[in-house]
């Protein structure tokens, strides 16, 4: 009897010890993964049918970079790696969907300098993100002067005959005027719509277009069985990354490159998005 009881207690102690060892090992593994993932840029590639895209532009290559957050939480090496891989793909067009710095204007110049290896034949088009609005005009100017980025702030540009890029101010920190942004576009134009915050897609759900966004970091820390964390300004929005349909518009949310709040990513590596556009 005593022996049986003692064996049972010993087994229970062993099981508890094993449980804590496994739990500790899992925690260490997740922490290690969180430290590693911010340094490993994942490339996602898609063929995307764009309504009203001229057939002469079928196969156009577009790279999307978003949320580099140059600052103390995102190593420059990660941003440079994303830029290097984008440049190696030789895109026809690069679109930048905001949050170039964490907060500090002093990071804008170095951030713009890191974009200079990109030389797409149709140029680089950018919008601002909510983190850029402490110094929006100065950050936009740095990106234009140093890297040649054409910044859209409730505006649109025809980058090739019959193909446009429209972009709005940030939905949290900026003053959005989507009517002004879309005013230059013919009703039958093929176009991409740039909105830092994915909620901006609601403003173009009546138009046939592809919308590109960032802001979410894909949740940044994605633990099994735990709902992802949505950043400010997305209350009630049903999607945190990937593709979705909103009326006539299709939306892609990139996980972005950088980090905020924590220098960690878990089950959510940084992303470079490469899109090959197809005439529909």
Where are these regions (language model features)?
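N-terminal secretory signal peptides and thylakoid transit peptides that target proteins
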Residues: 4-26, 30
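Membrane-embedded segments
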Residues: 60-147
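C-terminal segment of N-terminal export signals and the immediately downstream linker at the start
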Residues: 12, 31-63, 75-77, 84
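Conserved beta-sheet core of the metallophosphoesterase superfamily
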Residues: 198-273
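Active-site neighborhood of phospho(di)ester-bond hydrolases with catalytic His/Asp-centered motifs
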Residues: 65-66, 94-98, 124-130, 152, ...
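Active-site-proximal beta-strand elements of phosphoester/diester hydrolases
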Residues: 59-69, 162-170, 192-196, 250-255
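Binuclear metal-dependent hydrolase catalytic cores centered on His/Asp/Glu-rich metal-binding motifs
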Residues: 141-142, 146-149, 155-156, 160-195, ...
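Beta-strand-turn-beta hairpins that frame and shape the catalytic cleft
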Residues: 50-63, 149, 157-166, 245-250
């Amino acid at each position: 009897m005593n022996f049986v009881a003692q064996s049972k207690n010993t087994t229970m102690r062993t099981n508890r010890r094993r449980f804590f060892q496994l739990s500790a090992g899992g925690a260490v593994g997740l922490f290690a993964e969180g430290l590693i993932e911010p340094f490993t840029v994942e490339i996602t590639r898609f063929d995307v049918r764009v309504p009203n895209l001229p057939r002469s532009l079928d196969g156009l290559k577009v790279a999307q970079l978003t949320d580099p957050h140059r600052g103390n939480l995102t190593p420059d090496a990660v941003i440079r790696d994303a830029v290097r891989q984008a440049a190696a793909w030789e895109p026809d067009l690069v679109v930048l969907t905001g949050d170039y710095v964490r907060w500090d204007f002093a990071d804008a110049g170095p951030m713009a300098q890191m974009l200079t290896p990109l030389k797409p034949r149709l140029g680089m088009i950018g919008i601002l993100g909510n983190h850029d609005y402490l110094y929006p005009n100065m950050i936009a100017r740095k990106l234009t002067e140093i890297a040649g980025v054409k910044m859209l702030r409730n505006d649109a540009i025809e980058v090739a005959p019959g193909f446009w890029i429209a972009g709005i101010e940030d939905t949290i920190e900026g003053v959005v005027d989507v009517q002004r942004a879309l005013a230059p576009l013919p009703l039958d134009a093929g176009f991409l719509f740039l909105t830092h915050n994915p909620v901006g897609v609601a403003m173009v759900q009546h138009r046939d277009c592809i919308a590109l966004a960032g802001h979410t970091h894909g949740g940044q820390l994605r633990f099994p069985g735990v709902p992802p964390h949505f950043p400010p300004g997305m209350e009630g929005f049903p999607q945190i990354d990937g593709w979705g349909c909103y009326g006539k518009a299709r939306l892609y949310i990139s996980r972005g490159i950088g980090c905020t709040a924590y220098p960690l990513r878990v089950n959510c590596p940084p992303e470079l998005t490469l899109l090959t556009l197809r005439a529909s």
